[in-house]
Each structure stands twice: as C-alpha cells, then as structure tokens.
C-alpha cells in the first residue's frame, strides 16, 4: 500500500490524507462531455435546442432564442422586460393561459440537449452565478424522454425561488404516480440565509452545483455540501409509468431562467435585466 507521506519544515515525516484521497476519488471519473461556452455567439446548435413561447407553470416569460448567448467564456441567459409586444398565440376569450395573454411582458431563454445529448449515470457539474431578484426562477435540471412528465423523471440539480416570500435553493427529483401529470417528489428546500449567513456576498459569486448519479442514488451538492440524497429504490413510477424507474434511463439537460409563475413569485421588474451566467457544464462517467 502506498502512503501519502510528506515532510514538514524540520524534515519530520507525516501523512496528509485529504488531498490524496480527493485526487483518488476524482481520478475514478473521466470527462465524457463538456460545454465551456468559449465561442462568442449563440450556444452550439449541435448540442442545444431552444424552447419557444410560453412553456410551463404559468410563467411570465416568453422563451426565445436570442436571450441566450455566449460571451467571454460564459453562457448568458437574460430575462428582459418588453414593451407593447403582441403575443402571437393570443386568442380572445381563451381559457389557456398561454393564449389569453394579449401581450408578452417578459422574455428569457431555456436551452436543452433533448434529442442531442442524453446521459445515463455520471457526475454532472455546472459552475454558475444565479440571479436572486424577486420573481427569479433559475434552474439546472434534467428530464427523461419517451414518456410523459412526470413518469419521464425530473431531476432539479438547482432551482432558486421564493417560498412564502423567503428565498430558497432547492434540490429535487420527481417521478410518476397512478394519476396522469401527478408527481411524487423528493424535495429539499434550503433557506437562502443558510448560504448568505456564511457569505453575505454569496450572490455575487460563481458556485458549483454537482450531481452524482448511479444505479443506487442521486446525490446533489452545492460547493461540495450535500443538499439531497435520493435513493433510486423509492423512485418507481406508478401505473401511468408502468412501474418503470425513470432514473435508470437516460436524461437530457436543461438550463433556463424563468420568471414568476406558480413558484417564482412577484417579479421585481424595475429596469429589469436579470442575468444568469453559466461558466461550464461538464459530465463525467466511470
């Protein structure tokens, strides 16, 4: 057995475990894909798709391609306030929330790897700086393909929004039940003060969200702090999903900045230009 022996300034030997153990653990993982966002302009269209329009959760923003762009080695997703822009889906008298809005008040972007990059198990790392203004709902997440939500499975590596007016960071997973579009959740909501009490400048900095996912569990970390551990033994779909386990099937990635809706809350839109910055997305497997 090789021991990590080092010597102090007096030449006395000692064993320093921490760095070596971390190095050994990291060396088990091999990077299989990444996007470093190093080319200015639109994100790589061979990897990323774009949501278009009003998408989900009665959110306020209209998703469009132009609000996501790469600059200076980062992906920028911007939420912008619009003025007098007509909703092309508008139908007077409609009960559909997507169609009954006459105007588009806000725009943003959601990019996904659906149909282009899917992964089964691995370590997923995203280094990002998130907006924390009122109404902001940034996310790093994953979905399965081939089944309706939630039987396809959803993993929320990161969500930020307000719960009863107080900001939280969330780490979740959802899967199917016996009722269509009804999910079972394993969710952890950590008060934002848990982070800002330690570092008042937390929101001004980049942080690393990580998911370690194998055939036994999903573990979600923020700056190496474990936020949630979800055993795959509990994530079995109900009858709608035919008893399958969505987290033993491939998932694709999504990055988005939503506003308002059922979770985002009241939007602080004074001169709004919210910016969600992603330094990189990296995927490792053993």
Say what each PLM segment does.
Residues 21-286:
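GH16 jelly-roll
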